Amino acid sequence: MKTMKLWRNILVMTAAMLSFASCSSDDDEDFFTIGTDGIPMPATYHSVSQADFQKFIVGYCWKETEMHRINDDGSIEEKDYGWDLFGWCGPSYYEFGDQTIIHYVENTGIPAYVHYTMNYKYDYSNNIYINDNNHFYFRLISVSETTVKVIKWESETTDREGGYKPEFLYVVLKRLTNKELADVKEQYSE
């Protein structure tokens, strides 16, 4: 009888642990709500302070390591967007200065490695990077010393009624080391 109670207690404790583990998930960013401005927002969103933006972003270069399309219902496609469309065209890199971003991108159609500089501003009220013509922006989701997660405007597509709608991606960026950045600059200067 004691053995049966012991097994029952073990079973109850295991079920409780599994229940708590499934409730405490880091997947809060795996589902977005579409805001009135049409931009997806994560369910749990905390703005990134100006101090953290300066400390973690400015002066560093970041490489796209994951890109996932955000669907109209706010869910994220599991398949990597880069592989899905292009067989992975090569990651983009973003080097942030105080007021400019140098964007390094591989153009597989030519093929060529190109880079260009864009001006940006950081809107601290809603964490959007905007270049001069409001065409390209990120919305920061989370920032650490090594990883940045953003919502990225990718393009405009047509909807079923023939109108235009924005296409957004959930993107994970990793910070480059000084050596990696030097290698990127050398590769893209040729």
Predicted regions and their residues:
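Beta-sheet ligand-binding and adhesion/scaffold domains
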Residues: N131-E190
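Tryptophan-anchored aromatic micro-motifs
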Residues: G35-L85, M118-Y120
